[in-house]
Amino acid sequence: MKYNDLRDFLTLLEQQGELKRITLPVDPHLEITEIADRTLRAGGPALLFENPKGYSMPVLCNLFGTPKRVAMGMGQEDVSALREVGKLLAFLKEPEPPKGFRDLFDKLPQFKQVLNMPTKRLRGAPCQQKIVSGDDVDLNRIPIMTCWPEDAAPLITWGLTVTRGPHKERQNLGIYRQQLIGKNKLIMRWLSHRGGALDYQEWCAAHPGERFPVSVALGADPATILGAVTPVPDTLSEYAFAGLLRGTKTEVVKCISNDLEVPASAEIVLEGYIEQGETAPEGPYGDHTGYYNEVDSFPVFTVTHITQREDAIYHSTYTGRPPDEPAVLGVALNEVFVPILQKQFPEIVDFYLPPEGCSYRLAVVTIKKQYAGHAKRVMMGVWSFLRQFMYTKFVIVCDDDVNARDWNDVIWAITTRMDPARDTVLVENTPIDYLDFASPVSGLGSKMGLDATNKWPGETQREWGRPIKKDPDVVAHIDAIWDELAIFNNGKSA
């Protein structure tokens, strides 16, 4: 699944019936959200609104609205192939030298992919075909969506924010929502543990009073966007990972007003700075939990330059109660997580983040249990191994005879293999999602682990129940005569 940029990818989608062009005028204020939401819930195509009311720039929505399109964005044909992406990430996270010639031969595809890791810097780029600066900067010319009736203001949702800390060689790419508050002002909502916020904190400590350079790319190629939301090892840049996914080096260009590098093929780039100490109240906004979040203060991003392609496309989305686009992304990226976890915990058979659990707040893990207390070790491992699971409130651990993706199986295991007092683990005062208003303190809450495995000696003193199993000979015999029985046919059985 080869493509060079977002437009290339849209052409591929259109050829496969995965893109619908909407020529009817539609308002970015609430109407696009309503159409995109109905389309996503029906498993429909990506949507390109060619005539948003009041604007000359088209709006792209629902790009990653199905797991298949997420897989395509990662250079794969289908979701099942994303396990291979996870295996590659697991290898890069903890690379092992070849153990011999045969092992070297087996690892050659991985080593070959690594050759696509370095970025390629261009002198000129499509994203700088048109440039406005100073008083000519006007974010109101971009069809920024207002998604829900009580949202505070139009909101940029798919902005790829590029930052660099004062002591770091490589840049950080993150996706943070940005509230429009003026023709050249946005509120940068990044949580304190996120890469961009950490870069900013380090900058303030190293350069008191100096402006912090920031650039935001809109409409980057899908591999680069997905690289920013994937559990990339800390030693690997998101641009490098995008090159691995795409099979070609990521092309970047230096910004006009700062030294940051942005995707050369991005549709729009916002360049500017954060003035230390300048903050503004952000929100409320409807978010992925299905609720409006609290108002809180975040840094203000001042835009000094807007560069863009000719006939630029504005890429956007909405977030709300699942299913939404982030939930679909979570379903697809779930397949990437499994091999990474299995690399650290080989006993893990499957790992599932149900989308109805806001994509990350609840996890179901199945394991090949090997000793008493094993389930609790896995719980602690899930919470601590990848930062993506820092906010996972509930971890349910089951044996490998349970299908982690079937609630009927999981609920059966919980209700038959758990004693609430013995098999529930509660951990207090842990990092929790700022948007989780159920926690007693903003950003700090508790976690619960549920051990729904069969109990081993040492975990119980009682004789453990034996699951009912059918007689295989009887099953085979009934299979052979099933059609003759005609139970579900109108005709009579023989």
Curated annotation (Swiss-Prot):
Reactions mediated catalytically: a 4-hydroxy-3-(all-trans-polyprenyl)benzoate + H(+) = a 2-(all-trans-polyprenyl)phenol + CO2
UniProt function note: Catalyzes the decarboxylation of 3-octaprenyl-4-hydroxy benzoate to 2-octaprenylphenol, an intermediate step in ubiquinone biosynthesis.
Record key words, sorted: Cell membrane, Decarboxylase, Flavoprotein, FMN, Lyase, Manganese, Membrane, Metal-binding, Ubiquinone biosynthesis
Classification via Gene3D superfamilies: Single helix bin, UbiD C-terminal domain-like
Membrane topology: Peripheral membrane protein
Catalytic class of the enzyme: lyase
Quaternary assembly: Homohexamer.
Amino acids binding prenylated FMN: I175, Y176, R177, R189, W190, L191, R194, G195
Catalytic residue list: D287 (proton donor)
Subcellular location: Cell membrane
MF terms (GO), sorted A to Z: 3-octaprenyl-4-hydroxybenzoate carboxy-lyase activity; metal ion binding
Cofactor: record remark: Binds 1 prenylated FMN per subunit.
EC number: 4.1.1.98
Protein family (similarity comment): Belongs to the UbiD family.
InterPro entries to which the protein is assigned, alphabetical: UbiD (IPR002830), UbiD-like_C (IPR049381), UbiD-like_N (IPR049383), UbiD_bacteria (IPR023677), UbiD_Rift_dom (IPR048304)
GO term, biological process aspect, one: ubiquinone biosynthetic process
Annotated protein name in UniProt: 3-octaprenyl-4-hydroxybenzoate carboxy-lyase
Known cofactor(s): prenylated FMN; Mn(2+)
Lineage of producing organism: Bacteria, Pseudomonadati, Pseudomonadota, Gammaproteobacteria, Enterobacterales
Entry superkingdom: Bacteria
UniProt keyword Membrane present: yes
Residues annotated to bind Mn(2+): N172, E238
